[in-house]
Amino acid sequence: MKKFIALFLLSGLFLQVHGQKPEETEDWSRRPEVVTPGKGTLPPSDAIVLYGGAGDLDKWESDRDGPARWDAGEELTVVAGTGGIKTKESFGDMQLHIEWRSPSEVKGDGQGRGNSGVFLMGKYEVQVLDSYQNETYYNGQAGSIYKQSIPLVNACLPPGEWQTYDIIFKAPVFNEDGSLESSAYVTVIHNGVLIQNHVEILGTTEYIGPPRNDPHPAKLPLQLQDHGNPVSFRNIWVRPL
């Protein structure tokens, strides 16, 4: 009897599926936009280029006041003591590509060696650090979500070599009363290696104390940190999502 019922149900399922058409599960609601991928390290056709070399700082300003004061040529280099820089344009959800390198001459150790940071929305730091044969606390090494999430692996290249971060960021959402509706999430690929896999960001990345979730606008500038080390950047572009 049980075998008969099973066969009956199976035959019914077959007839149900057999009577359907493949077109019923085809989705024609949104045609994907055609985008031309960049060749090599060039940005894709729909990217906003934030720094492409040739001393172009038009899209940046100081995070203190006035114009950005970093050295700008084919690459963009931190000038210690001048403060960080931030984009004039604001971003929320985004795909970010950025290349960086620590100085080839090794000075210092731990957090004092090739230190900078990529601050998403100016609040959530993906750590930049020379972590090649350089021990420090693990949630503060290169590719960490600073003081929150240890990278899956250490994919750092030797000092002086160009490195890449490809970052997918989903901004947090706040309710009208200022409470957090949904956290920020981030995925980070370092030199082609996945090191943060859709990680929840618990709030602002603080040097001292726990993360905070103070409400803020849906879009804010991207910021690069002056931590006193001459770290260089190039080929910075973003795709708002």
Q: What are the residue ranges of the model-derived segments?
A:
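Carbohydrate-interacting regions of secretory-pathway proteins
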Residues: 19-241
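Positively charged n-region of N-terminal signal peptides that target proteins for export
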Residues: 1-4
